[in-house]
Amino acid sequence: MQLLNFGLLLLPFVAGDLAPQPEPLLAGPSDVVPGQYIVTLKEGLTSAQIRDHKKWVSSVHRANLDSFAAGASGVETEGIMKHFHIHDLNMYSGGFDEKTVEDLSRNPYVKSVHPDQHVYLAKTVTQRQARWGLGYMSSKGKPVPLHSTLVDYSYDDKAGEGVWAYVLDTGINVNHVEFEGRGILGHNAIPNKPHTDEFGHGTYVAGIIAGKTYGVAKKANVVSAKAFDTGSSTYNYILETYDWIVRNITDSNRKNKAVINLSISGAKYQPFDDAVEKAFKAGITTVVAAGNDGKDAKNNTPASSPNAITVGAVRWENTRPSFSNYGKLVDIWAPGELIKSCWKGGNNATSTQSGTSAASPHVAGLVAYLMSIENLPSPSAVTARVLNLTIPNLVKDAKDSPNRVAYNGIQERKFTLPKYY
């Protein structure tokens, strides 16, 4: 069994077409967490088989640690650490010596063993203020003035009410005035760290989804699911957080009233693509960023997950920013350059940023908005409705991507409520 060494990155903001700085698709050997792995089990195992397998792992790991060869590696390993169960997908993380990893790779119950990896936050770039993104979402793709503060954003007054948007990110400043008490601290996977947003990325993303001024779905609830902190994370924490989100949505009976946003990207990593796919089969919608590499998104995770809604970035005059990924797996295009939203540093703080990190929450907000006004019983129905509303053939330099820009459908409704922001 081949051991794969790929990673996942929280998407950086970029400086637009003036100075795009894409992250490398493949992380270097130094990013691997020594002795730590993600193990995916084969489908169809019974609870008893999984329980027996874990007992076997503990026994083999202990025996190997007791041997001189295992002890000579110099890597302290702790065995199975966390368990992940998403629909019928069973995975676990663990700290294992090399001999135990070899034994795991040969075990008939094991589908794959992937090294865990550090995931890094990149620096953000603050840019001049702009207010075009929301107006674009209700204009049927009509180019809008970049710096105008009088662009109409028209929407149904339900505006995401009764819907929950889960943001797997750096946390959310739930006390920011933009959230009006609709921000919820859900899960913090980072040990010994407060559930706050020290980097701004998660708060920014949440503001585009549900901020009273900057949000697409202005009455939706936003749930903070923190998997990143001081610039670094691992799949151990990302999978834990995604698992928690899926469980929380399921246990709260919110499947048709919840959406997950993932403004993260990295090289193709099958365990996480599998997790997103299993969430879809469980009845949960996930919206993901296409990535900021200026390349085909087919080599990125989670953009390549077949049933995620993958979002590329478009500029105000309907061109693709050079940083935005593209390709047949990009389902839809949404505003992603010079977008203003909430930020860290205070309950009124704002920042203007660029990247597919901004494009993805526009569509996650659109999903929340549509869930509040229409009966969309499944992720398939959600995806079909979002794509049915899109405006075709507007994006210049879309490469071989489906050429569809996001639209909220307001001009086809019987009533239109003009709003200003």
Swiss-Prot record:
The active site is at 169 (charge relay system), 201 (charge relay system), 357 (charge relay system). Residues 1-16 form the signal peptide. Pfam families: Inhibitor_I9, Peptidase_S8. CDD domains: Peptidases_S8_PCSK9_ProteinaseK_like. InterPro entries: PCSK9_ProteinaseK-like (IPR034193), Peptidase_S8/S53_dom (IPR000209), Peptidase_S8/S53_dom_sf (IPR036852), Peptidase_S8_Asp-AS (IPR023827), Peptidase_S8_His-AS (IPR022398), Peptidase_S8_Ser-AS (IPR023828), Peptidase_S8_subtilisin-like (IPR050131), Peptidase_S8_subtilisin-rel (IPR015500). Transmembrane segments: none annotated. SUPFAM superfamilies: Subtilisin-like. It is found in: Secreted. It comes from the Eukaryota. Glycans are attached at residues 248, 261, 348, 388. Keywords: Glycoprotein, Hydrolase, Protease, Secreted, Serine protease, Signal, Virulence, Zymogen. Its main location: secreted. One of its GO terms (molecular function) is serine-type endopeptidase activity. Belongs to the peptidase S8 family. This is Subtilisin-like protease 2. It comes from Arthroderma benhamiae (strain ATCC MYA-4681 / CBS 112371) (Trichophyton mentagrophytes).
